Swiss-Prot record:
GO CC, any one term: intracellular membrane-bounded organelle
Protein name in the entry: T-lymphocyte activation antigen CD86
Subcellular location: Cell membrane
Extracellular side, ranges: 24-244
Covalent S-S links between cysteines: C40-C110, C157-C216
Leader sequence residues: 1-23
UniProt GO BP: adaptive immune response; B cell activation; cellular response to lipopolysaccharide; defense response to virus; positive regulation of immunoglobulin production; positive regulation of non-canonical NF-kappaB signal transduction; positive regulation of T cell proliferation; toll-like receptor 3 signaling pathway
The organism of origin for this protein: Mus musculus
Subunit structure: Homodimer. Interacts with MARCH8. Interacts (via cytoplasmic domain) with PHB1 and PHB2; the interactions increases after priming with CD40. Interacts with CD28.
Function: Receptor involved in the costimulatory signal essential for T-lymphocyte proliferation and interleukin-2 production, by binding CD28 or CTLA-4. May play a critical role in the early events of T-cell activation and costimulation of naive T-cells, such as deciding between immunity and anergy that is made by T-cells within 24 hours after activation. Also involved in the regulation of B cells function, plays a role in regulating the level of IgG(1) produced. Upon CD40 engagement, activates NF-kappa-B signaling pathway via phospholipase C and protein kinase C activation.
Keywords associated with the record: Adaptive immunity, Cell membrane, Disulfide bond, Glycoprotein, Immunity, Immunoglobulin domain, Membrane, Receptor, Signal, Transmembrane, Transmembrane helix, Ubl conjugation
Cytoplasmic side: 266-309
């Protein structure tokens, strides 16, 4: 093999090993519409001037965010989507990406190259994994209809403009650890890619309960957010209505008592009719016996008449 080829291969292997050994991987997080920090810490900065280096960042699609070429910003190779959105901190070797959007999530590479008279040598590569978060709005409970005597309560809870996708939303009610909710819905904005969530609940006052407190809870991967508590009080009956109900109840009770007395009074009189019939039969029997006795005395009466004459 040609010695020059051998030397070239050795240099290539050396540069590759150097690149792998000096590769750095970091994770960073930014808020939606905020600023992301993409570090590129250079351990050899004390020995090499920035004017001797080429430093640039590119995204996972190989689009250039920023390039610092031998001490000067170079905008020719910067992609249009990143123009005006970046600033370079020379002291910390960090690129600031402004106005971060959900679509900016992903991996970014920073390359530091030395520019010798011929060619270039990669001195360091830093891989940054960027995640973007957006705080959901505080859950808000809205009443769908007014609370009246025995009517149900229809509630809706909403929270908007958050990221990443929420896990769930539910209602909590006084003195209960159960999670309530009838219809949880999650939607995502096509432009901002932020999520909104809502849930609804229909409930009524249990018997004997006059007060209830309801709270809506949004649960994400990292936190729980609660709404302001909403208090409900069922209206007590007015005094006039109360006394009307009492009067009606007492009247019904008296009518029932009177009806019961009448029924009980009639039952013992029913068997008295046969006793009247029996006494009549007894009187008829006595009359018959008297008739029979008179017939037996007729001969005696007849014989006594001549003597009397």
């Amino acid at each position: 093999m040609d010695p020059r080829c051998t030397m070239g291969l050795a240099i290539l292997i050396f540069v590759t090993v150097l690149l792998i050994s000096d590769a750095v991987s970091v994770e960073t997080q930014a808020y939606f519409n905020g600023t992301a920090y993409l570090p590129c810490p250079f351990t050899k900065a004390q020995n090499i001037s920035l004017s001797e280096l080429v430093v640039f960042w590119q995204d996972q699609q190989k689009l250039v965010l920023y390039e610092h070429y031998l001490g000067t910003e170079k905008l020719d190779s910067v992609n249009a989507k990143y123009l005006g959105r970046t600033s370079f901190d020379r002291n910390n070797w960090t690129l600031r990406l402004h106005n971060v959007q959900i679509k900016d999530m992903g991996s970014y590479d920073c390359f530091i190259q030395k520019k010798p008279p011929t060619g270039s040598i990669i001195l360091q590569q830093t891989l940054t994994e960027l995640s973007v978060i957006a705080n959901f709005s505080e859950p808000e409970i809205k009443l769908a209809q007014n609370v009246t005597g025995n009517s149900g309560i229809n509630l809706t809870c909403t929270s908007k403009q958050g990221h990443p996708k929420p896990k769930k939303m539910y209602f909590l009610i006084t003195n209960s650890t159960n999670e309530y909710g009838d219809n949880m819905q999650i939607s995502q904005d096509n432009v901002t890619e932020l999520f909104s969530i809502s849930n609804s609940l229909s409930l009524s006052f249990p018997d004997g309960v006059w007060h209830m407190t309801v709270v809506c809870v949004l649960e994400t991967e990292s936190m729980k957010i609660s709404s302001k508590p909403l208090n409900f009080t069922q209206e007590f009956p007015s005094p006039q209505t109360y006394w009307k109900e009492i009067t009606a109840s007492v009247t019904v009770a008296l009518l029932l008592v009177m009806l019961l007395i009448i029924v009980c009074h009639k039952k013992p009189n029913q068997p008295s009719r046969p006793s009247n019939t029996a006494s009549k039969l007894e009187r008829d029997s006595n009359a018959d016996r008297e008739t029979i006795n008179l017939k037996e005395l007729e001969p005696q009466i007849a014989s006594a008449k001549p003597n009397a004459e």
